A protein has these predicted regions:
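A structural signal for multi-pass alpha-helical bundles of membrane permease subunits
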Residues: 1-190
C-alpha cells in the first residue's frame, strides 16, 4: 500500500485504488520541497546516534557499579532505580518539560537527549551481564595497578561486546521510535 500510494496522487490513494501510478517523481519533489526529508532524516540519525552512545556509556557504567562495588544502601538505590520503570513516561513529561524550560534547553538537541538518558532497563540489563564477569580478574587488575577506567574500558568491555551490541540496538530503537518527547520540546521548525 505504501509503495502504490507513493506513486499515485492523493485523490487516487483516498479512493482505495491499489495500482501503481505515474506520480512518483512529482510526489517526491513535493515531499522534498515541503518538508526537506533528507535534512530531517540526518537530524534524527544524529540525535539517535548521540543518544545511543551516551546512554550505553552511562547505563553500562551504572550497571557495573551496582554489581561490582560494595557500599551501604546500594541495593536500596538500585531498587528505587528499578521502581522508576513503573512510572509511565506520560506522568514524567510535565515535570521534565518544566525542568527543560527552566534550564533554557527547549528547541535544542540537549532537550531531546538528556532527560531520558539513564534507562533503568539498560542498567538492569548490564548489571545482570556483569554478574557473570569474574570479580577475580578485576581484583587482579587493581593489584597490577590499573585504574577503574582502564579496568572498565579495556578489561570488562572487551569480552562483553555482544551485551553492548544488544544494549545499543535497544537504545537506538527506543530513541528512534521516540516521537512524542521531541514533538513537545522542539517547538520550531529550525
Amino acid at each position: 500500500w505504501m509503495l502504490t500510494g507513493a506513486t499515485n496522487k492523493s485523490v487516487d490513494v483516498t479512493s482505495g485504488a491499489l495500482h501503481f501510478g505515474k506520480s512518483l517523481g512529482e510526489n517526491w519533489t513535493n515531499l522534498q520541497s515541503s518538508a526537506n526529508v533528507f535534512l530531517v532524516f540526518l537530524n534524527s540519525m544524529k540525535i539517535t546516534l548521540i543518544y545511543t552512545f551516551i546512554s550505553i556509556l552511562i547505563c553500562s557504567m551504572a550497571g557495573y557499579g551496582f554489581e561490582k562495588y560494595r557500599s551501604k544502601g546500594k541495593n536500596i538505590v538500585y531498587s528505587l532505580f528499578l521502581f522508576s520503570m513503573m512510572i509511565p513516561f506520560s506522568a514524567q513529561m510535565i515535570p521534565l518539560f518544566k525542568m527543560a524550560s527552566k534550564a533554557n534547553m527547549l528547541n535544542s538537541h540537549t532537550a531531546v537527549i538528556l532527560p531520558t538518558l539513564a534507562m533503568p532497563f539498560l542498567v538492569f540489563f548490564f548489571r545482570q551481564s556483569f554478574q557473570s564477569y569474574p570479580t577475580e580478574l578485576i581484583e587482579a587488575a587493581r593489584i597490577d595497578g590499573a585504574n577503574e577506567f582502564t579496568i572498565f574500558f579495556r578489561l570488562v568491555m572487551a569480552p562483553m561486546k555482544s551485551t553492548f551490541a544488544a544494549g545499543a540496538i535497544y537504545a537506538f530503537m527506543k530513541q528512534w521510535n521516540n516521537y512524542l518527547w521531541p514533538l513537545i520540546v522542539i517547538q520550531t521548525n529550525e
